[in-house]
Design a protein with these regions (language model features):
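Gly/Ala-rich beta-loop-alpha elbow adjacent to hydrolase catalytic centers
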Residues: 138-142, 146
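Membrane-embedded segments
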Residues: 51, 55-126
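Short alpha-helix in the alpha/beta-hydrolase fold that links the catalytic acid
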Residues: 85, 190, 199, 213-222
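Short beta-strand/loop motif that positions the catalytic acidic residue
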Residues: 197-198, 203-205, 209
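Catalytic histidine-centered segment of alpha/beta-hydrolase-like enzymes
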Residues: 236-247
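An N-terminal hydrophobic leader/cap segment in hydrolases
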Residues: 2-49
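Catalytic active-site module of serine/aspartate enzymes centered on a nucleophile-bearing elbow/loop
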Residues: 245-263
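Acidic catalytic loop of the alpha/beta-hydrolase fold
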Residues: 208-212, 239-240
Length: 263
């Protein structure tokens, strides 16, 4: 009698490495998130449509000002973690579109560098129909996503919190004995893209950031064209409240985004 047992499914080494490295980069929270209206009064649940056919959950928080901010999250959690910052921006007159990438917060698909770029483009397409002036805000890994989008579709302003030169450089700092360049397929080479930026740039870094050292953020900033501004938050580590949504960070973002409204 012939065996019905299935043979194991082997992946080519390069694809296997790619699958494994993504598990070390992306840390999505499982399950869905609550309704936007329960987060902030007037919040709207919206759906983004990507070019490759995915439907992604998002929140839109309208405000009275002229500008909207497209927020690109970091590599962990979901948009609920960024709600306090979104609320602070709305209180200061900035509308906010806050979305989750593929594979995050119950969204279909699996995250990858090109996939997250497609998700950000879908967010920009949606926001184009709801605001005349759009600024981008990206944190950590999301800073690389926002920068790539900014080169493709220039915003009124680009604001990056804890950005890095490349994911390869971050990996080398944390794993100096590993051949990081050979292991990573998602490299997020922001340093190679930023010279083509055509928008005002704000970079915010934590002086004690243990995940993305401020030196990497400064190197990226130094490679960018003018106009630009660099802000160092004293004593702040990567996930400290003062760097996530502290008063200084909120004030810098609001000031920079609103300055882009002036002719």
């Amino acid at each position: 009698m012939a065996s019905t047992r299935k043979s194991p499914r082997w992946l080519p080494p390069r694809r296997l490495i790619g699958a494994l490295q993504r598990r070390l980069i992306y840390f999505p929270s499982p399950g869905s998130v609550r309704s936007a209206a329960t987060v902030l009064r007037g919040g709207q649940d919206v759906v983004l449509h990507t070019d490759d056919g995915l439907r992604l959950g998002a929140w839109f928080f309208p405000a009275d000002g002229h500008s909207a901010v497209l927020m690109c999250n970091g590599n962990a959690g979901d948009r609920c973690m960024r709600a306090p910052l979104a609320a602070a921006l709305v209180r200061n007159g900035l509308s906010v579109l806050l979305f989750d990438y593929r594979g995050y917060a119950g969204n279909p698909g699996r995250p990858s560098e090109d996939g997250l770029a497609a998700d950000a483009r879908a967010a920009r397409t949606w926001l184009d129909a709801h605001s005349d002036r759009i600024a981008y805000l990206g944190e950590s890994l999301g800073a690389a996503v926002a920068l790539r989008l900014a080169v493709e579709h220039p915003p009124s302003a680009l604001m990056l919190r804890s950005p890095f030169t490349s994911l390869t450089d971050v990996g080398r700092l944390h794993y100096p004995r590993l051949p990081v360049a050979q292991l990573l397929s998602d490299r997020y080479p922001s340093i190679d893209r930023i010279e083509n930026l055509g928008a005002p740039l704000l970079v915010i870094a934590g002086a004690r950031d243990s995940i993305v050292p401020a030196e990497l953020s400064r190197r990226l900033y130094d490679a960018a064209p003018e106009p630009k501004r660099f802000v160092l938050v004293p004593g702040a580590d990567h996930n400290d409240p003062e760097l996530l949504d502290g008063p200084e960070v909120v004030a810098e973002i609001v000031r920079f985004a609103q300055a882009s409204e002036r002719p």
